[in-house]
A protein has these predicted regions:
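Residues that recognize and position ribonucleotide moieties
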Residues: 218
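Cell wall/extracellular polymer interaction/catalysis modules
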Residues: 28-215, 224-270
Length: 270
């Protein structure tokens, strides 16, 4: 996740602690770890059949007056990483099972993540999220050894040398033959501390096609993305959750996730 706009400092602090504990080799995970997303009022949930599935289903939820999750709108198909999913670095505690997201592995990060800034090709967008219209000089740095790793930068500010080796121009329509996948989207705040080689530049964005997976992002129909951006509000502290079905069933109670998405990810609606 690029670091140009992160969620509240309290969330970043807890996420940092989780990363440092993992890097220190901590083997003990509390039975009921802190949930920095407990105050989230909006939640985007993506469930996939298993760790290797490259497509799944997206649902949106908001809390009612009683604090319960209620689905908003309809379920939509999505594509994720070409190699499936792997645990990412987000708001959730480290998990003992399953693959781990690494730079260039083609997996989408699994877990609970803050939703960051929206972006797109146009100067403005119909969203309450902070929004940045991208220019030809904007890149997301996916070079693990760069001091700008996992950040969206402007070459007019950092210089051309700073983006050497990056494969993530934010104006794909200009640099990649008219590609519309980044026409509109938002940042999924994976790896906020920019741990080298842990994965970078994770977005929710428009898909190339319903059957074309991504390098690690979550992609969907443009109309679905537009509805999401029109609905999301920064004051609701929205979060993005991606889990394989088995892990969702296991964690939805302990993690206080919506409880009515079970069993719906196996039908291929592409």
């Amino acid at each position: 996740m690029p670091a140009f706009n992160s969620i509240a400092g309290r969330i970043r602090h807890v996420a940092c602690i989780a990363v440092l504990l993992a890097l220190a080799g901590c083997a003990h995970v509390p039975a009921n770890p802190p949930q920095p997303w407990r105050d989230a009022g909006q939640l985007v949930l993506v469930t996939v059949a298993d760790w290797n599935a490259d497509h799944g289903q997206l649902r949106s939820f908001e809390r009612d007056d009683a604090g319960q999750w209620v689905q908003v709108g309809t379920t939509a198909p999505v594509v994720i990483g070409r190699a499936g999913a792997g645990w990412g670095l987000g708001l959730h505690p480290m998990q003992p099972d399953g693959p781990t997201k690494q730079e260039g592995d083609g997996r989408a990060p699994a877990g609970v993540f803050a939703i960051g800034q929206a972006f797109g090709y146009a100067p403005h967008a119909a969203t309450a999220l902070p929004y940045t219209g991208m220019d030809a000089g904007d890149y997301c740095i996916d070079v693990s050894t760069s001091p700008l790793y996992n950040r969206i930068v402007d070459t007019a500010v950092v210089g051309e040398a700073a983006i050497e080796g990056s494969t993530e121009p934010m104006r794909r329509d200009i640099h990649a033959g008219g590609d519309q996948r980044y026409r509109i989207g938002f940042v999924v705040e994976h790896n906020p501390q920019a741990v080298p080689a842990a994965g970078s530049c994770i977005f929710a964005h428009v898909w190339k096609s319903p059957t074309t997976p991504t390098a690690g992002c979550t992609a969907m129909d443009a109309a679905v993305m537009e509805r999401l951006l029109a609905w999301l509000r920064p004051d609701a502290d929205p979060v993005f959750v991606l889990l394989p079905q088995a892990q969702y069933l296991q964690l939805r109670g302990p993690w206080a996730l919506p409880g009515d998405a079970a069993g719906a990810t196996h039908a291929d609606s592409r």
